[in-house]
Amino acid sequence: MNITTALPLPTHLLSEKVTAPLLGARKIYITGSRQDIRVPMREIALTPSSARYGGNENLSLALYDTSGIYTDPQATIDLACGLPRLRAAWIDERADTVEAALYFKVPESVSVTAPPFPTAPRPRRARDNVAVTQLEYARRGLVTPEMEFVAIREQQRREQTVENLRGQRHAGDAWGALVGTPITPEFVRDEIARGRAILPNNINHPESEPMIIGRNFLTKINANIGTSALSSSIAEEVEKLVWAIRWGADTIMDLSTGRDIHATREWILRNSPVPVGTVPIYQALEKVGGHVEALSWAVFRDTLIEQAEQGVDYVTVHAGVLRDFIPLTASRLTGIVSRGGSIMARWCQAHRSENFLYTHFEELCEIMRAYDVAFSLGDGLRPGCIADANDAAQFAELEILGELTHIAWNHQVQVMVEGPGHVPMHLIKANMDKQLAACGEAPFYTLGPLTTDIAPGYDHITSAIGAAMIGWYGTAMLCYVTPKEHLGLPNLQDVHDGIIAYKIAAHAADLAKGHPAAQARDDALSKARFEFRWQDQFHLSLDPEKALALHDESLPKEAHKRAAFCSMCGPQFCSMKISQEVRDASSNELSDGNTNTNDAI
């Protein structure tokens, strides 16, 4: 192995912009039944209402937090050491894994332009004939520390939050999901055992904080990062990781296709508190020089084991792109738009053979269960434009993904299923309905969908519309789209804009489903707005810094943050100020009426 550059990731590259606590937030930890279960949350302390509004205390709000230790001022951050190995003791206690001989080593002949991670741990794998998946544990009736961690995280101090809701909580329509059920460790276990949720935690990624993906839980979002052959570096991608989780990415997919894929992934995994997904076919193709015809099952198998040893938590596998389905795409306007799907279609044609990922699927399962890597069954034939939505090719593949889901479950492997794509609004619900029927309620994970094709540069908006809808119908995780979609590799600002758009979509979906704690944040912000508690409004926002900046563009003085108006209406035309005056007058009239009545008596 020939290393040609110095360490690219000094700690100082993570600026305060990336690591400082979010405005108005405090990192807190809630301890579970054992001292090493410490669940992070972001607490927003609220100011009291003024005397005019009752003078009451406003209780703090605990919010779901994905940022890891990076926003904890007490934490020491050193990218070269990686994050604390949060789950290492839990994995050891189960005594069902062994230290494995390193399966993959970078060949001496390969020129590496970035150094390996300096303290990479030895990989572990399952003991012979043992499955070490959360699905296996759940089916055995075992509630793991990971499951308890998830239950506390999803519950979000729900009892306190719901009790303090000021307004009426809307019931919502969950389309058959169980969103009102209290989230207990036993509920988490049962959902995983039924295959309706996954807890993606590779035994070789002990740094990850357990989270869950399923339609009976909070709607999650994924952010894609990764180097390309033309731009970006390991340093930039690690910074994108930290930036993405700061704003709320629940998982990360490393879609690197350039040089140093192995090293890039190692740096990301060792510094990621959220699950990391990949598409192994990209690296497999790099190994054969980019020649699709040279791909083989053996190359893919070795690549999958390499990534499992590093700690990848879930992998996209395009095993549903069958040879017989390829002609169904011939009449499409944009053909096959999935990179992985197009690679496998080309391989099938070149070899006049069936997709090796399909024919070797049970062998894939045996690898996955030895590390607890979850399947993200790829929709290689997803529609790439509105014209191709809901066509025969898309739904033929979906039926195969349903078959593969049940095969994976038989091997105790966790599964979620990927979905489109580009779909007009009136066709979105059919996608959710067909997936639930074909895939036995396995979690659905969709890219958008984009609801129109006319807005390059704004596809984070066109897709967030579809994401909110399909999230309401039951999609468990939404893959973000950035403004750079179809145009280029996203930078930090693009990542931020994509995540905020998708946090809005996910939260809107949770509100529509009637998630018990979802409305609490809306009510708290609305109350702060009506009472002109400007700082609380900023702090409760998805993007506090932007809310503050936009307010201060026209009213920058500190006194303006106590004013009962904004620059939109000014002091004379503020509807909320006038509404309060109406309320005060009505209260006085009622009081006067009561007094007069008493006097008459």
UniProtKB/Swiss-Prot annotation:
Residues binding substrate: 224, 253, 282, 318, 338-340, 379-382, 418, 445
Residues involved in [4Fe-4S] cluster binding: 566, 569, 574
Biological process according to GO: thiamine biosynthetic process; thiamine diphosphate biosynthetic process
Gene Ontology MF term list: 4 iron, 4 sulfur cluster binding; carbon-carbon lyase activity; zinc ion binding
Domain of life per record: Bacteria
Residue sites binding Zn(2+) per the record: 422, 486
Cofactor note: Binds 1 [4Fe-4S] cluster per subunit. The cluster is coordinated with 3 cysteines and an exchangeable S-adenosyl-L-methionine.
Family: Belongs to the ThiC family.
Entry-linked NCBIfam families: PRK09284.1 (NF006763), PRK13352.1 (NF009895), thiC (TIGR00190)
Subunit structure: Homodimer.
Listed name of the protein: Phosphomethylpyrimidine synthase
Species for this entry: Xylella fastidiosa (strain 9a5c)
